[in-house]
Protein backbone atom coordinates (compact mmCIF):
# COMPACT_ATOMS: atom_id res chain seq x y z
CA UNK A 1 0.00 0.00 0.00
CA UNK A 2 1.51 3.32 -1.06
CA UNK A 3 1.86 6.06 1.52
CA UNK A 4 0.15 9.31 0.73
CA UNK A 5 2.47 12.30 0.44
CA UNK A 6 1.57 15.21 2.66
CA UNK A 7 1.16 18.43 0.69
CA UNK A 8 0.49 21.90 2.04
CA UNK A 9 -2.39 23.65 0.34
CA UNK A 10 -1.23 26.32 -2.09
CA UNK A 11 -3.11 28.98 -0.14
CA UNK A 12 -1.13 28.27 3.05
CA UNK A 13 2.17 28.38 1.14
CA UNK A 14 1.15 31.66 -0.43
CA UNK A 15 0.25 33.16 2.96
CA UNK A 16 3.57 32.05 4.47
CA UNK A 17 5.50 33.63 1.60
CA UNK A 18 3.57 36.88 2.02
CA UNK A 19 4.28 36.90 5.79
CA UNK A 20 8.02 36.29 5.27
CA UNK A 21 8.19 38.98 2.61
CA UNK A 22 6.36 41.46 4.83
CA UNK A 23 8.66 40.62 7.74
CA UNK A 24 11.76 41.16 5.57
CA UNK A 25 10.43 44.50 4.35
CA UNK A 26 9.71 45.55 7.93
CA UNK A 27 13.22 44.62 9.08
CA UNK A 28 14.72 46.50 6.15
CA UNK A 29 12.66 49.57 7.00
CA UNK A 30 13.67 49.44 10.67
CA UNK A 31 17.35 49.08 9.71
CA UNK A 32 17.09 52.02 7.31
CA UNK A 33 15.55 54.17 10.02
CA UNK A 34 18.24 53.17 12.52
CA UNK A 35 21.12 53.83 10.12
CA UNK A 36 19.87 57.11 8.67
CA UNK A 37 18.22 58.81 11.62
CA UNK A 38 20.05 61.80 13.12
CA UNK A 39 18.90 60.50 16.49
CA UNK A 40 21.56 57.76 16.26
CA UNK A 41 24.40 59.96 14.99
CA UNK A 42 27.38 59.85 17.39
CA UNK A 43 27.51 63.03 19.45
CA UNK A 44 29.83 62.01 22.29
CA UNK A 45 33.00 59.89 22.45
CA UNK A 46 34.35 59.08 25.92
CA UNK A 47 37.98 57.87 25.98
CA UNK A 48 39.33 56.25 29.13
CA UNK A 49 42.99 55.58 30.05
CA UNK A 50 44.34 57.42 27.00
CA UNK A 51 44.78 60.87 25.52
CA UNK A 52 43.86 59.68 22.02
CA UNK A 53 41.17 61.60 20.16
CA UNK A 54 38.33 59.96 18.26
CA UNK A 55 36.54 63.08 17.10
CA UNK A 56 36.25 61.59 13.60
CA UNK A 57 33.57 59.24 14.94
CA UNK A 58 31.23 62.11 15.69
CA UNK A 59 28.41 62.50 13.19
CA UNK A 60 28.67 58.89 12.05
CA UNK A 61 25.74 56.56 12.58
CA UNK A 62 26.32 54.47 15.68
CA UNK A 63 25.07 51.29 13.97
CA UNK A 64 27.28 51.77 10.92
CA UNK A 65 30.49 51.70 12.97
CA UNK A 66 32.55 48.54 12.67
CA UNK A 67 33.83 48.36 16.22
CA UNK A 68 36.16 45.43 15.54
CA UNK A 69 38.00 47.38 12.84
CA UNK A 70 38.14 50.49 15.03
CA UNK A 71 39.53 48.42 17.91
CA UNK A 72 42.23 46.78 15.77
CA UNK A 73 43.27 50.14 14.33
CA UNK A 74 43.54 51.76 17.76
CA UNK A 75 45.49 48.78 19.15
CA UNK A 76 48.17 49.16 16.46
CA UNK A 77 48.93 52.63 17.81
CA UNK A 78 49.05 51.53 21.45
CA UNK A 79 51.76 48.89 22.04
CA UNK A 80 51.35 49.16 25.81
CA UNK A 81 47.69 48.10 25.52
CA UNK A 82 46.53 44.50 25.57
CA UNK A 83 43.13 45.51 24.24
CA UNK A 84 41.17 48.54 23.06
CA UNK A 85 37.45 48.10 23.62
CA UNK A 86 34.73 50.12 21.87
CA UNK A 87 31.24 50.16 23.38
CA UNK A 88 28.02 51.54 21.88
CA UNK A 89 25.88 53.42 24.36
CA UNK A 90 22.57 54.16 22.68
CA UNK A 91 21.44 56.40 21.27
CA UNK A 92 24.53 58.47 20.40
CA UNK A 93 27.56 57.75 22.61
CA UNK A 94 30.68 55.63 22.10
CA UNK A 95 33.01 54.64 24.96
CA UNK A 96 36.62 53.70 24.17
CA UNK A 97 38.50 51.78 26.88
CA UNK A 98 42.28 51.39 26.61
CA UNK A 99 43.15 48.33 28.69
CA UNK A 100 46.82 48.64 29.54
CA UNK A 101 49.28 45.79 29.82
CA UNK A 102 50.40 44.97 33.34
CA UNK A 103 54.20 44.79 33.62
CA UNK A 104 55.66 41.89 35.58
CA UNK A 105 59.33 42.76 34.97
CA UNK A 106 61.74 45.09 33.22
CA UNK A 107 64.06 43.75 30.51
CA UNK A 108 67.55 45.26 30.19
CA UNK A 109 68.66 46.24 26.68
CA UNK A 110 70.32 49.51 25.64
CA UNK A 111 67.39 50.81 27.67
CA UNK A 112 64.83 49.09 29.85
CA UNK A 113 61.57 47.74 28.46
CA UNK A 114 58.57 46.60 30.45
CA UNK A 115 57.34 43.08 29.76
CA UNK A 116 53.98 41.51 30.63
CA UNK A 117 53.14 37.90 31.53
CA UNK A 118 52.51 37.10 27.85
CA UNK A 119 56.06 38.16 26.94
CA UNK A 120 55.12 41.36 25.10
CA UNK A 121 57.56 44.28 25.36
CA UNK A 122 56.39 47.86 25.80
CA UNK A 123 57.77 51.15 27.05
CA UNK A 124 57.68 51.63 30.83
CA UNK A 125 55.91 54.70 32.18
CA UNK A 126 58.23 55.22 35.16
CA UNK A 127 55.82 54.53 38.02
CA UNK A 128 56.89 53.55 41.53
CA UNK A 129 55.35 50.12 40.91
CA UNK A 130 57.67 49.56 37.94
CA UNK A 131 60.69 50.59 40.02
CA UNK A 132 60.09 47.59 42.29
CA UNK A 133 59.85 45.07 39.44
CA UNK A 134 62.57 42.47 38.88
CA UNK A 135 64.98 43.16 36.01
CA UNK A 136 65.72 40.49 33.41
CA UNK A 137 69.32 40.42 32.14
CA UNK A 138 70.85 38.44 29.30
CA UNK A 139 68.35 39.16 26.51
CA UNK A 140 70.44 41.82 24.79
CA UNK A 141 72.43 39.15 22.92
CA UNK A 142 69.30 37.18 22.00
CA UNK A 143 67.00 39.93 20.70
CA UNK A 144 68.34 42.82 18.65
CA UNK A 145 66.36 46.06 18.47
CA UNK A 146 63.24 44.97 20.38
CA UNK A 147 60.03 46.65 19.24
CA UNK A 148 57.23 47.71 21.61
CA UNK A 149 54.04 45.72 21.23
CA UNK A 150 55.82 42.62 19.92
CA UNK A 151 55.90 39.22 21.60
CA UNK A 152 59.24 37.46 21.17
CA UNK A 153 59.25 33.68 21.49
CA UNK A 154 62.51 32.86 23.23
CA UNK A 155 63.24 30.11 25.81
CA UNK A 156 65.08 32.73 27.89
CA UNK A 157 61.92 34.84 28.13
CA UNK A 158 59.77 31.80 28.93
CA UNK A 159 62.16 30.81 31.72
CA UNK A 160 62.27 34.30 33.22
CA UNK A 161 58.47 34.64 33.17
CA UNK A 162 58.10 31.18 34.70
CA UNK A 163 60.46 32.14 37.54
CA UNK A 164 58.49 35.34 38.20
CA UNK A 165 55.15 33.53 38.18
CA UNK A 166 56.23 30.69 40.46
CA UNK A 167 58.12 33.02 42.80
CA UNK A 168 54.96 35.08 43.33
CA UNK A 169 52.77 32.04 43.88
CA UNK A 170 55.12 30.47 46.45
CA UNK A 171 53.83 31.51 49.89
CA UNK A 172 57.17 30.72 51.57
CA UNK A 173 58.98 33.25 49.37
CA UNK A 174 56.36 35.97 49.78
CA UNK A 175 58.44 38.01 52.23
CA UNK A 176 61.49 37.98 49.92
CA UNK A 177 61.99 40.32 46.97
CA UNK A 178 62.91 39.03 43.53
CA UNK A 179 65.45 41.64 42.40
CA UNK A 180 66.87 40.32 39.13
CA UNK A 181 66.95 37.32 36.80
CA UNK A 182 69.92 36.44 34.61
CA UNK A 183 69.16 34.25 31.59
CA UNK A 184 72.37 34.86 29.64
CA UNK A 185 72.98 31.12 29.76
CA UNK A 186 69.97 28.83 30.29
CA UNK A 187 72.01 26.13 32.05
CA UNK A 188 73.45 28.72 34.40
CA UNK A 189 70.33 30.85 34.75
CA UNK A 190 69.89 32.43 38.14
CA UNK A 191 68.08 35.02 40.19
CA UNK A 192 68.99 37.43 42.94
CA UNK A 193 66.78 37.63 46.02
CA UNK A 194 66.63 40.41 48.58
CA UNK A 195 66.17 39.43 52.20
CA UNK A 196 62.96 40.32 54.04
CA UNK A 197 63.11 43.39 56.28
CA UNK A 198 63.23 41.44 59.52
CA UNK A 199 66.39 39.63 58.37
CA UNK A 200 68.06 42.76 57.02
CA UNK A 201 67.61 44.49 60.36
CA UNK A 202 70.16 42.13 61.92
CA UNK A 203 73.04 43.16 59.65
CA UNK A 204 74.40 46.18 57.86
CA UNK A 205 73.68 46.47 54.10
CA UNK A 206 76.61 45.88 51.78
CA UNK A 207 78.02 49.43 51.31
CA UNK A 208 78.65 49.24 47.57
CA UNK A 209 75.22 47.77 46.82
CA UNK A 210 72.95 49.27 49.45
CA UNK A 211 70.96 46.04 49.83
CA UNK A 212 71.42 42.55 51.20
CA UNK A 213 70.54 39.32 49.48
CA UNK A 214 71.87 36.23 47.78
CA UNK A 215 72.07 34.52 44.41
CA UNK A 216 70.05 31.44 43.46
CA UNK A 217 71.38 29.32 40.60
CA UNK A 218 68.37 27.57 39.15
CA UNK A 219 69.21 26.51 35.58
CA UNK A 220 66.31 25.57 33.29
CA UNK A 221 63.38 23.24 33.83
CA UNK A 222 61.33 22.23 36.90
CA UNK A 223 61.08 25.84 38.07
CA UNK A 224 58.13 25.27 40.39
CA UNK A 225 59.76 22.29 42.12
CA UNK A 226 63.09 24.08 42.50
CA UNK A 227 61.47 27.14 44.08
CA UNK A 228 59.57 24.88 46.47
CA UNK A 229 62.92 23.38 47.48
CA UNK A 230 64.30 26.90 47.86
CA UNK A 231 61.44 27.82 50.18
CA UNK A 232 62.12 24.79 52.35
CA UNK A 233 65.85 25.56 52.53
CA UNK A 234 65.22 29.16 53.55
CA UNK A 235 62.89 28.08 56.32
CA UNK A 236 65.58 25.75 57.66
CA UNK A 237 68.33 28.36 57.35
CA UNK A 238 66.24 31.15 58.85
CA UNK A 239 69.00 32.32 61.23
CA UNK A 240 71.67 32.19 58.53
CA UNK A 241 69.80 34.11 55.82
CA UNK A 242 72.06 37.14 56.00
CA UNK A 243 75.13 34.93 55.68
CA UNK A 244 74.09 33.13 52.47
CA UNK A 245 76.21 33.89 49.41
CA UNK A 246 74.39 31.66 46.94
CA UNK A 247 72.19 28.58 46.69
CA UNK A 248 72.66 26.19 43.77
CA UNK A 249 69.56 24.19 42.81
CA UNK A 250 70.82 22.82 39.51
CA UNK A 251 71.91 19.48 40.92
CA UNK A 252 70.21 16.60 42.68
CA UNK A 253 71.47 17.81 46.04
CA UNK A 254 71.11 21.58 46.66
CA UNK A 255 74.27 23.47 47.58
CA UNK A 256 74.29 26.37 50.04
CA UNK A 257 77.41 28.55 49.99
CA UNK A 258 77.91 30.86 52.97
CA UNK A 259 79.92 34.06 53.04
CA UNK A 260 83.47 33.84 54.41
CA UNK A 261 83.47 30.07 54.01
CA UNK A 262 86.03 28.54 51.67
Q: What does each model-identified segment do?
A:
Residues 1-46, 50-78, 82-262:
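Charged, solvent-exposed interaction patches on well-folded alpha/beta domains
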